[in-house]
């Protein structure tokens, strides 16, 4: 009887994907597509923007596929954990951008020239994150959006 119970328990673990080693199977990474756009893209866009899809993903590894559709401008994507009050974001009027040494920056795509793409992976915990382009003038021109990470 005891042996049968052990066999049934082992079969249950196998069917649940928890054996061998009793480690649950890895969850696939979430994928977020990010389009960097501005008026030079020629799609009737009248402002700068980061277009993100989807706006919510599960916690864990997140893969960002970033594409710059601009014809003229280099853009970037920073993933930041924002402060409680956005009004307290450290902004340099002289540099016309956020002061990166004073923000909680989790990832930086570097600069994508017009037509370039880039992929980056970031491990994110549940919470709200701000995706921004911090090239001079771009953050204030609207190149920012939110990403929600759930359990």
Task: Describe the predicted segments one by one.
Residues 3-7:
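N-terminal export leaders
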Residues 62, 68-98:
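Contiguous segments within soluble domain cores/interaction surfaces
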Residues 29, 52, 59-61, 72-74, ...:
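Extracytoplasmic
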Residues 22-28:
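Sec/Tat signal peptide C-region and signal peptidase I cleavage site
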Residues 9-20:
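Bacterial N-terminal signal peptides
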Residues 29-61:
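N-terminal edge beta-strand
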